[in-house]
Amino acid sequence: MFKTTLCALLITASCSTFAAPQQINDIVHRTITPLIEQQKIPGMAVAVIYQGKPYYFTWGYADIAKKQPVTQQTLFELGSVSKTFTGVLGGDAIARGEIKLSDPTTKYWPELTAKQWNGITLLHLATYTAGGLPLQVPDEVKSSSDLLRFYQNWQPAWAPGTQRLYANSSIGLFGALAVKPSGLSFEQAMQTRVFQPLKLNHTWINVPPAEEKNYAWGYREGKAVHVSPGALDAEAYGVKSTIEDMARWVQSNLKPLDINEKTLQQGIQLAQSRYWQTGDMYQGLGWEMLDWPVNPDSIINGSDNKIALAARPVKAITPPTPAVRASWVHKTGATGGFGSYVAFIPEKELGIVMLANKNYPNPARVDAAWQILNALQ
C-alpha cells in the first residue's frame, strides 16, 4: 500500500513543472518517516532546496532524556561532510595564490623528510590518492611530534596518483597544510574565510558554551555520545552545524557566482572540479560527483562502506574538468552517534541535507535523498 502511494506521488510530482510546498511536504514525509522508523533514528532534520529556496522539516528528539525536540537550531555533528568545508577552504587558499595543488607536501612541512614523501603533492592528499594513507590517524597520536612520527613511518602501498583509498589522514593533512601560509589556525581560517562570509553563524568546529544548549546528543547502542577529540579531527570530521546553516551551505555550492568574495567563489568551484575518475564517480576537493542524469544504483551502492572505503584505481583528469552543472554532487558523513548526507544538482537548483543523531547505513540515506530529489527534478 505504502509503496504504491509513494510511487504514484513521485510520478505526479516529477511530471509537474512546479511542486507546491504541500507536495514537497508530502514527498519528504512519505520518504523520511518510514526511514526514521526502520532505522530507529531518535531525531532528524531535513532541508530540501527547491528552485533555490529552502524547506525545513524536523522529527524527534535532540536529547531523549530531556525530551528536547529537534529544531531548525539544533546542532548536529556532520562527520565527513566536514570534508566539503575543508575542500572549499583549500580552494580558497588556491584562489588567493597561497598554495597550489601541484606543490609537494614537503614544501609546507619540511620536517617530512622520509623518502616515500617524494612526489606526493597537496592534490594527492586532498583526493585520497597519496598511495594508501589509512582511514584514521591512530588514537595514540596526541602531539605534533607524534603526528610527524606517524607520517614519517607510514609506508605507501602504491605509487601516488594510482589508487584512491578514502582516508581522514589524507584530507586531514591537506587541510592542516593548506592554511599554513595564511598564518591562521585551521579553525580561524575556516571561520573568517568560509563560515563568516557565507553567514553560517551557527556552524562550529568547537561548539561555544552559549550554543551547547542546542547541541544534540548522538545515540549509539542506546547511549548518548559526542565525538571524541582526535588528531586532524577539525580538518576531517569536526564540523557541527544546524539544518538552516547547511541549507545555506548547499545554496552557496549550488550558485557560487552569487557569493561576493571572489576567492571563496573560486574555492567552491575548485572543490567541485573533477581531478580523478574511478568508475562513474569523479573526485573533487571534499565533494564527489557523478554525471547527471545519474543511475540511482550507482550512487546508492557506491555509498556502501564496502565500496566507498575500498581501494580503487583512478584515472587522472588532466587538466581537471571545471565544475559541471549537470552533476549529482554529494557527500556522506558520520561520527559514532550521528549520520549526515548532502546532495545537490546545480543544473536543477535542487538539493537536500539530511542530519540525524544516529549513524545509520549510507545506502539508506542516499536512497531516501534520491527518491525526494528525483520526484522534484
Curated annotation (Swiss-Prot):
GO terms for biological process: antibiotic catabolic process; response to antibiotic. Inhibited by the beta-lactamase-blocking agents avibactam, enmetazobactam, relebactam, nacubactam, vaborbactam, taniborbactam, zidebactam, and beta-lactam-analog boronic acids, via a covalent binding to Ser-80. Inhibited by non-beta-lactam, benzo(b)thiophene-2-boronic acid (BZBTH2B) and various cyclic boronates. Not inhibited by clavulanic acid. Inhibited by O-aryloxycarbonyl hydroxamates, via cross-linking of the active site Ser-80 to Lys-331. Weakly inhibited by citric acid. The class C beta-lactamase family has a specific amino-acid numbering system known as SANC, for structural alignment-based numbering of class C beta-lactamases, or else the simpler name structural position. A multiple sequence alignment was used to derive a consensus sequence and then the consensus was numbered taking into account insertions and deletions. This allows use of identical numbers, e.g. for active site residues, despite differences in protein length. It comes from Escherichia coli (strain K12). Residues 1-19 form the signal peptide. Belongs to the class-C beta-lactamase family. The active site is at S80. Keywords: Antibiotic resistance, Hydrolase, Periplasm, Signal. NCBIfam families: bla_class_C, BlaEC, CMY2-MIR-ACT-EC. This is Beta-lactamase. Induction: Can be induced by beta-lactams. Expression is not up-regulated by the non-beta-lactam inhibitor, benzo(b)thiophene-2-boronic acid (BZBTH2B). It catalyses: a beta-lactam + H2O = a substituted beta-amino acid. It comes from the Bacteria.
